[in-house]
Amino acid sequence: MDKGSALVRLPYWDKLSESEKKYVSEHAVIRSYRKGEVVHGYGGACLGTALVLSGRMRAFILSEDGREITLFRPQEGESCVLSASCVIQRITFDTHMVAETDCELLVIGSAAFDKLVEENIYVKCFLYEVATERFSEVMWTMQQILFLKIDRRLAMFLSEECDRSGKSEVRMTHEQIAVQIGSAREVVARMLKRFELDGLVKLGQIGRASCRERV
């Protein structure tokens, strides 16, 4: 996608003055990432803000022992302003982001976006609206991890993946599923086996599970 076509997809584009549109155009870039590639984090520079033009990303935090906890998964048409604490200065934790599929992003650097926020009330409202939505997703994730049993979290994840893809089959390894629901690979493997014995899923070759019914 060319930059001109990408810029008009910004939710606040129509609220910018001509000079602001020119400024954004000069400071925005389109970046492509392959599946599994690091988008932000691990000591890299601040990404700024990003609009997902195609594909899907995964945002997560790392525990002290290196375990990944998935926070949210921005997909096509969605914006991400929590890609680093440098965007909203009062954020006291850093998120890491990887490309969950091949994806293309429209990226606006943090300094340029910060200038827009200070000068345009519509952009400022957009920033806090998206931040609020993301924090709601983070809180939902934390509630699941803290208060839902692993079998329920796993069942919900499998159902959501089937809804997302429109298929009754989930092609992921035990390790990948564990990362998504904040658990351990061994726990996921045992739970999937139990689901299969209960007739809820059918486990195929490595990395494939078919949902026979919703749990």
Features from the language model and the residues they span:
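Short phosphate-coordinating micro-motif centered on Lys-Gly-acidic
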Residues: 39-44
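Cyclic-nucleotide recognition modules
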Residues: 72-129
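Cyclic nucleotide-binding regulatory module and flanking cytosolic helices
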Residues: 1-30, 34, 84-88
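Glycine- and acidic-residue-biased ligand/ion/polar-headgroup-sensing regions
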Residues: 36, 47-60, 75-77
